[in-house]
Amino acid sequence: MYSYRNTRAHNSILVNGMTQTIGTEGYGWIPRWYEGEKISYMVGDASNAYGKITAPIWLKRGELSGTQYTPEKGWDENKLKMFRRHIIQLGNTGVYVIYDELEGKEAVTWSYLLHTVELPMEMQELPDEVKVTGKNKDEGISVAHLFSSAKTEQAIVDTFF
């Protein structure tokens, strides 16, 4: 459960190291969506997706499996005020633009997670951005340009915790 049910295993955001909750009390929704030939757009709102595990069924499953729903494992109080992810697809070009709107209830540390399966990612710290390049064995390439209004720290790791 620390991987497939945990936000750490997905290309998403951690808030002070905390992951999205499990259960119906944590949820996201899609307020806008458009699909066209030249451009497609959607925005997902995950503002209510973070917090402690409180659903009785998941508390019981955690107990039975030995899963610890603790801050050290990524589950704690919600410090998130807003998380909206905008995704734009430019026709059939293979180009996607992802823009995250993030706001904390207080000053928080944001962790933007990117995962790769086959080959390690490469990271470049440039003056106004961080550029992350991922490749696969079939010559596929993905490039992420990360921009932030605050100072950033980067790390490439091969573990979830």
Predicted regions located by residue number:
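Conserved catalytic cores of ATP-dependent inositol ring kinases
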Residues: 141-146, 156-158
